[in-house]
Amino acid sequence: RGRDDDDEENPRDPREQYRQCQEYCRRQGQGQRQQQQCQIRCEERLEEDQRSQEERERRRGRDVDDQNPRDPEQRYEQCQQQCERQRRGQEQTLCRRRCEQRRQQEERERQRGRDRQDPQQQYHRCQRRCQIQEQSPERQRQCQQRCERQYKEQQGRERGPEASPRRESRGREEEQQRHNPYYFHSQSIRSRHESEEGEVKYLERFTERTELLRGIENYRVVILDANPNTSMLPHHKDAESVAVVTRGRATLTLVSQETRESFNLECGDVIRVPAGATVYVINQDSNERLEMVKLLQPVNNPGQFREYYAAGAKSPDQSYLRVFSNDILVAALNTPRDRLERFFDQQEQREGVIIRASQEKLRALSQHAMSAGQRPWGRRSSGGPISLKSESPSYSNQFGQFFEACPEEHRQLQEMDVLVNYAEIKRGAMMVPHYNSKATVVVYVVEGTGRYEMACPHVSSQSYEGQGRREQEEEESTGRFQKVTARLARGDIFVIPAGHPIAITASQNENLRLLGFDINGENNQRDFLAGQNNIINQLEREAKELSFNMPREEIEEIFESQMESYFVPTERQSRRGQGRDHPLASILDFAFF
């Protein structure tokens, strides 16, 4: 049986899950590298589960639960009182002893939590992660540089204002980011299927974060991360999906009643996976990890989907075949019962849905696969992969490139009405303020660091606490824009609602690469507010003067002074222009750009 929202509806104790995770790592008996990687995942899962637990309590409007008070001493006292009321004699003594043991365990875990918050500890853990997860020396170097920057920023915050002149402004920005309803930190993407060979991660339902995203509530994001020389077990989903390879190479096979299609996929390739099609993916590369990012559109329940595995692993109920009674299976498969039992028992010896495979088997699975450009057409065909790299860039200059695959040109994308785009912003450059006419864009940070600023009329000025307002309240606040901002790093996700002006910048030391899914992408128009091709320049003279209450010449001096289009450097190229006290500065004040 597939898993999706079970943990959200019936949350388990994060500490107990952490203990089980550590026990699982010890049982594996793998080498030191695998043990370290497993332990790091346990620690990350604990931190994420604790944050999720706090978020659930915050949404329910209760900071303190009377049945389970947060204060450890109150919990201990409550435990002792329950022992007095409900136990007698020897049972009461054992009950009190368990209360004491629980208090000691919580104290040890609090101490470990304090260690995890220590910047030095975080820095060493970050460095270990780089050594384990990144294969190439160049990626390891970039990862370690990010660790160093984060460590220095943390030190600057703790040293006080004298060591960080911009500390107060940075603090406000970090507070805003924590409450940003459109931003999802990489650590908030939960692992649903995890083993030593990889994991499948789901982003929470968009409406779990905020009702502002109810327009895309029937879409989900899933990320596959697989080690070299691995295969994912065959399965199908009750969801349409579009998948993009963001790292490594893959061979993906689709099986339906009439057809079987295999495709070799490179980084930047896009493929549609129809609902109900049995699919399996292999990573036959011996060195590089595989990462695939998928946008799903469930077909049964809005925002909810399941994965259905024919072959189970670890847990007997993971295979849908196991739920059928023996007499049904014996008759349907024409196979004796004892042979079926051996068949199912053999599957339970594996751990997880991503498994290691021999080079011989992997070569056999990929030898008849087609590549992008070889597109089969049939009633149940996926249409084959699309290579974003082979598309001509929609926007390009020395500061960045933007590629896109449109539903108008690719039949594979029409059913979900999704446009897929890939942007690379060079270090120290910006994709200028722009907005989408009808598409809401879900963006995944493939690589690099940067930040974005977005103008939004739906959030309040107080740490975005008004994000769930009713429609009437939203209408009353029309025209009152607030800046929504976040710092971006690899693995983060953010959403750009239709009509919202946004600017995205890359950091000074590395390029920023972004993958975008434009929902309602057919015939979407992208309008730019700066650069040579901005829409302000197309306004009539009288419209400009009436709008900005200034002479046309001064307005045009501002909007025509940028020599580049779409992507520009963040450093000023010209000495022309005015300071913030110039009257025309109000043009961009509405969006805080």
Curated annotation (Swiss-Prot):
Residues 175-193, 206-225, 246-265, 302-321, 318-337, 382-401, 414-433, 438-457, 478-497, 542-561, 558-577 are annotated as: T-cell epitope. The keyword ATP-binding does not apply. Residues 529-556 form a coiled coil. Pfam families: Cupin_1, Vicilin_N. Glycans are attached at residue 229. Residues 46-123, 150-184 are annotated as: Disordered. CDD domains: cupin_7S_vicilin-like_C, cupin_7S_vicilin-like_N. Keywords: Allergen, Coiled coil, Copper, Glycoprotein, Metal-binding, Seed storage protein, Storage protein. This is Vicilin Jug r 2.0101. It comes from Juglans regia.
